[in-house]
UniProtKB/Swiss-Prot annotation:
May function as part of a signaling pathway that acts to regulate the size of the body fat depot. This is Leptin. Gene3D superfamilies: 1.20.1250.10. Residues 1-26 form the signal peptide. Expressed mostly in the liver. The keyword Signal applies. Coiled coil: none annotated.
Amino acid sequence: MDHILALVLALLPLSLCVALPGALDAMDVEKMKSKVTWKAQGLVARIDKHFPDRGLRFDTDKVEGSTSVVASLESYNNLISDRFGGVSQIKTEISSLAGYLNHWREGNCQEQQPKVWPRRNIFNHTVSLEALMRVREFLKLLQKNVDLLERC
């Protein structure tokens, strides 16, 4: 037992000097949060411009970490029909934000790929409009909870 304790104590200084793979640099995290907030604000403004708020409230997914955010954004983007008017730029920006977060997540998280909801081919306009409203609410929630992106 004494040998194990001595070995642990001898290796402790070495383990403190070696950086953990995937250890988060505070500057990188703050830069990521700032960029996500900026992109989310732009997306909310663009959605509001093309699809004004009609006072309806939609339930949104929870912001639980970067993996859940990527999955939600990609899923909402899949639900928005390409044929729905005025959404091509919005879809591009959602894809850009999801791609940015996914790239950051791959470099800083050890988790699996996020699971994306399947695309639906019925009631395209209704599903697209609801997905747009939900992604708007989700982005507002994301801006308030941007600190949770540090989690995987």
